[in-house]
From Swiss-Prot:
The lineage of its organism: Archaea, Thermoproteota, Thermoprotei, Sulfolobales, Sulfolobaceae. This is Protein LS215_2186. Belongs to the CinA family. SMART domains: MoCF_biosynth. Pfam families: MoCF_biosynth. InterPro entries: CinA (IPR050101), CinA_Arc (IPR023055), MoaB/Mog-like_dom_sf (IPR036425), MoaB/Mog_dom (IPR001453).
Length: 263
């Protein structure tokens, strides 16, 4: 398979403590995967400047095609993503006019004064661009560095989703010429451990992702959801998935499995 790697960085004490479920990383992962990227790593760090700098630097050093972060762009003392990204890139924060105008317009429309805390959201790393946030105040941050698309999004899910789409539609440079496709088989009466050697051989033979997801207890009434997925040229990956699916169906029949249309 061809790979266009991506990484996700989630910033927030509330995620690490378990108070907030990391649905942002799940959404970003699904969206990037749908574009043909392979998400190689998701990193979660606390609202600490050194941790944020380290997370960005390490991700950049691995040279993925795209890095997307969520969280830490707001007006409070513990919103440190812009500063952390700037330090990771070796640049200063600067008042970004586009970001400032976006923020000023939103507060002015509501007759709310622009305090220093609100103005803080307009400071971006030098060379970065503001990404429109149509669902909130803090703009996203985009910078193209060492052939890597880097995007920082707010932590509020609806804002993150909006900023991510604006980035994909208007700014993303590294666009895979690949297609991500997947198919599923649902089967009863086959234990995951019994199917495992067949899966292992097919992964080796076709260089494709096959994952068995158990939906019940193996020793009582085994039910499996089998995922077959890959990225590549659309026609090539379609053919490969179909071949794998047919060979898996043959293996399931040998094991006296029962194919279902869904779970």
């Amino acid at each position: 398979m061809d790979y266009w790697f991506a990484e996700i960085v989630t910033i927030g004490n509330e995620v690490l403590s378990g108070k907030t479920v990391n649905t942002n990383a799940s959404h970003i992962g699904r969206r990037l995967t749908s574009l043909g990227f392979t998400v190689r790593r998701i990193t979660v760090v606390m609202d600490d400047i050194d941790e944020i700098v380290s997370a960005f630097r390490e991700a950049i050093d691995r040279k993925p095609k795209v890095i997307v972060s969520s969280g830490g762009l707001g007006p409070t003392w513990d919103d440190k993503t812009a500063e952390g990204l700037a330090k990771a890139l070796g640049v200063n924060l600067e008042l970004n006019k586009t970001a400032f105008d976006m923020i000023l317009e939103k507060y002015t429309k509501r007759n709310i004064p622009l305090t220093e805390e609100r103005k803080k959201m307009a400071y971006l790393p030098y060379g970065a661009m503001a990404v429109e946030n149509n669902e909130g105040i803090a703009p996203g941050i985009y910078i193209y560095h060492n052939n890597i698309d880097i995007l920082a999004t707010p932590g509020v899910p609806r804002e993150m989703e909006n900023v991510l789409e604006n980035f994909i539609n208007k700014m993303l440079r590294n666009k895979p010429n690949l297609k991500y496709l997947e198919d599923f088989i649902y089967v009863e009466n086959v234990m995951e451990s019994a199917l495992a050697p067949y899966v292992k051989e097919l992964v080796k033979k076709y260089d494709i992702y096959i994952k068995t997801h158990p939906k019940s207890y193996e020793l009582l009434r085994p039910i499996l959801e089998i995922q077959i997925a890959g990225s590549g040229r659309e026609e090539e990956i379609k053919v490969k998935i179909e071949k794998v699916k047919n060979e898996l169906l043959d293996a399931i029949k040998k094991l006296n499995g029962i194919i279902r249309n869904s779970l």
